[in-house]
């Protein structure tokens, strides 16, 4: 069985992430969506909220061969512990590629048996970023349906706007 891990902060999960997960399923038998924690990053949602929301969204989409997990540490270590040979990374633009390629080089030095698969974003999701969702969320009456599923919007709205 070909298994891949798709790591990210998912702060929050977007249609861009979901598109990459769907496309990964065309390549792999199983995809583990890994809600990762980067200690140098400041998050909008707590670790538990990011994990719970990502898990709820994946569940609502009825993906039978997608699991959601969480991890704090090097993704390559998670892959090794779980006998996963592939890491999927999404690429929106050239600057994403620069960052992801550097991660690939580090991972390759740590364990050359784990491959990184770079998937470019679909044209309709090139502009979708969790950062934009967070900024737009602070505005009232903004339609975020092109950025996030309704479940995400409602959860964020109840947390940040309805208070």
UniProtKB/Swiss-Prot annotation:
Location relative to the cell: Cytoplasm
Keyword Methyltransferase annotated: no
Pathway this chain belongs to: Cofactor biosynthesis; coenzyme A biosynthesis; CoA from (R)-pantothenate: step 4/5
Keyword Nucleotide-binding set for record: yes
Chief place of localization: cytoplasm
One matching Pfam family: CTP_transf_like
Alphabetical UniProt keywords: ATP-binding, Coenzyme A biosynthesis, Cytoplasm, Magnesium, Nucleotide-binding, Nucleotidyltransferase, Transferase
EC number assigned by the record: 2.7.7.3
Family listed: Belongs to the bacterial CoaD family.
UniProt subunit comment: Homohexamer.
Function, as annotated: Reversibly transfers an adenylyl group from ATP to 4'-phosphopantetheine, yielding dephospho-CoA (dPCoA) and pyrophosphate.
Identification of the protein by name: Phosphopantetheine adenylyltransferase
């Amino acid at each position: 069985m070909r298994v891949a891990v798709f790591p990210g902060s998912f702060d929050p999960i977007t249609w861009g992430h979901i598109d990459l997960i769907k496309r990964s399923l065309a390549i792999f038998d199983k995809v583990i969506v890994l809600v990762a924690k980067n200690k140098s990053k400041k998050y909008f949602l707590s670790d538990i909220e990011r994990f719970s929301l990502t898990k709820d969204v994946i569940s609502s989409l009825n993906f039978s061969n997608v699991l959601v997990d969480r991890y704090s540490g090097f993704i390559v270590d998670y892959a090794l512990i779980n006998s996963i040979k592939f890491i999927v990374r999404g690429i929106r633009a050239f600057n994403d590629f620069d960052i992801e390629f550097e991660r690939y080089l580090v991972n390759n030095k740590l364990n050359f048996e784990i491959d990184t698969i770079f998937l470019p974003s679909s044209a309709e999701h090139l502009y979708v970023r969790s950062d934009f969702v967070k900024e737009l969320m602070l505005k009232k009456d903004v339609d975020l349906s092109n950025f996030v599923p309704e479940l995400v919007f409602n959860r964020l709205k109840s947390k940040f706007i309805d208070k």
